[in-house]
């Protein structure tokens, strides 16, 4: 099974020694090159990186990579192996292609474990780290185009939980 996990990055950094991982520079069209393949070849939205961040790389991968499975991780956050102790060296805990394939044999989507943040909610975390207006515009678009999804957004935003990576390097 061909699996490609793009490693979203903007600078040189350690990448697992597994051919499944492909480091891709996000926003390559608008930022200085860092030595990795950029998200600005083929069908791409690299020039919109300021608005879409890592999604420019995911868009690039979906339109330019021929793989059975395509995924994305942040350059410092990888999926952790279930087979290794959580006290092991973080770099040795990164999930391998073999282990990921065994998981994908039973499911189509792999997500990290949910983490609980008691200091703030998903909504307050987003507006502190990003732009409140973006979230409000997103809510308005959902209300207008897909109103059946609005109760879910209303449910998720006040929660103090999020799905994030469990293995940071």
Where are these regions (language model features)?
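ER/Golgi luminal nucleotide-sugar-dependent glycosyltransferases, focusing on the catalytic module
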Residues: 1-169
């Amino acid at each position: 099974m061909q699996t490609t996990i793009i490693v979203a990055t903007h600078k040189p950094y350690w990448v697992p020694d597994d051919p499944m991982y492909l480091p891709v520079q996000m926003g390559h069209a608008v930022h200085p090159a860092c030595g990795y393949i950029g998200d600005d070849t083929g069908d791409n939205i690299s020039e919109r990186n300021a608005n879409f961040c890592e999604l420019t790389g995911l868009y690039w991968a979906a339109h330019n990579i021929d793989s059975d499975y395509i995924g994305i991780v942040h350059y410092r956050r990888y999926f952790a192996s279930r087979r290794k102790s959580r006290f092991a060296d973080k770099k040795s805990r990164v999930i391998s292609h073999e282990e990921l394939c065994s998981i994908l044999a039973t499911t189509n989507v792999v997500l990290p474990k949910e983490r609980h943040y008691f200091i703030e909610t998903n909504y307050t975390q987003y507006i502190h780290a990003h732009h409140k207006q973006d979230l409000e515009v997103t809510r308005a678009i959902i209300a207008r185009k897909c109103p059946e999804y609005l109760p879910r957004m209303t449910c998720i935003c006040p929660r103090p939980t999020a799905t994030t990576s469990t293995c940071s390097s």
